[in-house]
């Protein structure tokens, strides 16, 4: 008996061709979490017309008093859009080309992830794994949006370790034979996007075959000889770890109300996502920086020195062979290093200090920002930042295989504007 594939074709819903891409698509909800003005500009760009902005809850609003009303409005918009806006569909995958501002073209395949083949539980080794530690307190707010929702729309980006370019790139080579389902410029400097429906049974079989090969024991043992014989890893979460975890948590909650037969086919068992090849030149793995608010830069530096002394971490000024980073405030920036770090990665050592500091300064708040210019701007407004060193993408899968998960928010795939924009939808409430 063939096992259920971990990534498979879906009944994907799309808006009317009359709705411009620049109005319809908006960036992932977990971006610009300290920049309310960005989301106000997004609302202006949508111009009151149908937009995926109406189907999501930007995290900048998570702590607002009206969050329940916002979620109710989202669910109402989903019902309306299902009837009146999502008038087209593709049965299969969507092959996507995203042209970034730099001119690089990022290729991907949108399909559905089997949540039964994924777990964020510590120590679990399913075919699909998170790339970072899952903070369970971040799941309930996202579950509140998904619970009872008619639709999902994905910003999750999965990664395949496919150096031979067997999964996605061959589909791109045949795009002229495919039905184009959308194309246009994305709002607010998001670049250009185009999508083609992949519905030909021969192409679907080709994708399935390539995925099976990537997830085979033979391929796993060849790629990761240090872990030979271990449970194969087919896909890793690149962006959207907590969104996929929330979908999983909602599914586990719903499963309890379903018969075994219903569990095999209920659409909420799956979650839409885009799969990309980590080896693509268009995939950049960048560090995520830490920014503290409501703190004084000098006080943070003194606390850091005291913490380092108590943990024998060997902090020093200047760039050392071990873990280097930049501590930046409103008026000054210093390169510092740990000569005897307490964690394998710089980000892990910094996170250990931040946890210590936050426990002693209840007024402090921390945010995680991908873009260095955005970090510098926050520093000019009074923030204190820990700027992380570069992250080597070649170590991503090895880190997951050998070490489980990376520290929370270790890396980001590209700048904020390059994140996945919501484009496709899928019904998760009833039969597809």
What are the language-model segments listed below?
Residues 1-190, 195-199, 221-225, 391-406, ...:
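N-terminal extension/subdomain marker
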Residues 159, 237-238, 274, 387-389:
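Short beta-strand segments
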Residues 307-375:
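C-terminal structural cap/anchor segments
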